[in-house]
Amino acid sequence: MSRIGKKPIPIPDKVTVTLNGANVAVKGPKGSLERTLPEKVTVTQEDNTIVVSPVDNSRTARERHGLCRTLVANMIEGVSQGYSKQLEIIGVGYRAQVQGNKLTLNVGYSKPVEMQMPEGVTAAMGEKNTQVIISGIDKEVVGNTAAKVRAVRPPEPYKGKGIRYQGEYIRRKAGKAGKK
């Protein structure tokens, strides 16, 4: 059995969980999420906790046990607290703007790069116009959106210019050695 999968998931106040076979629906103060879990795993609700258990002892059931427990736990945390990723834009003249549901990046290309935020995800500016905060209730969508924004101009190893996650360490390389 999975060490992670064995742990019961506590349900906080103001969060309701509806189980319908393999479908799990979670409602909370920030919104609601639905997900269909893979086969070979059963989800049961006992008092104020949710328990995920494998159907049998097969390899696929054991593989999916911890996965399903983490997916449900992420849904509960998302509707109660939400998720956010912070990105830093480093480079001379590099900046970002948020207009409604659209993020515009000026990162050294001839034209600005415009990105439409998916449903349920919001982009906001940090203290400076070189910080972008991407937030939402679905951890997977927030992470994918942040990765797509970072992929527009990933940090390069020589000068460190580009878009990076806040606190991300970039391995730097030495430049070409000059001629003697």
Curated annotation (Swiss-Prot):
The entry's protein name is Large ribosomal subunit protein uL6
The UniProt record lists the keyword Signal: no
Entry's Gene Ontology cellular component terms: cytosolic large ribosomal subunit
- What this chain does, per the record? This protein binds to the 23S rRNA, and is important in its secondary structure. It is located near the subunit interface in the base of the L7/L12 stalk, and near the tRNA binding site of the peptidyltransferase center.
The entry sums up its family as follows: Belongs to the universal ribosomal protein uL6 family.
The GO biological-process annotations, alphabetized, read as: cytoplasmic translation
Question: What InterPro entries would the database entry show?
Answer: Ribosomal_uL6-like, Ribosomal_uL6-like_a/b-dom_sf, Ribosomal_uL6_a/b-dom, Ribosomal_uL6_bac-type, Ribosomal_uL6_CS
Which HAMAP family does the entry link to?
A: Ribosomal_uL6_B
Cite the record's note on assembly.
Part of the 50S ribosomal subunit.
A GO molecular-function annotation: rRNA binding
Name of the gene: rplF
Q: Give the record's keywords alphabetically.
A: Ribonucleoprotein, Ribosomal protein, RNA-binding, rRNA-binding
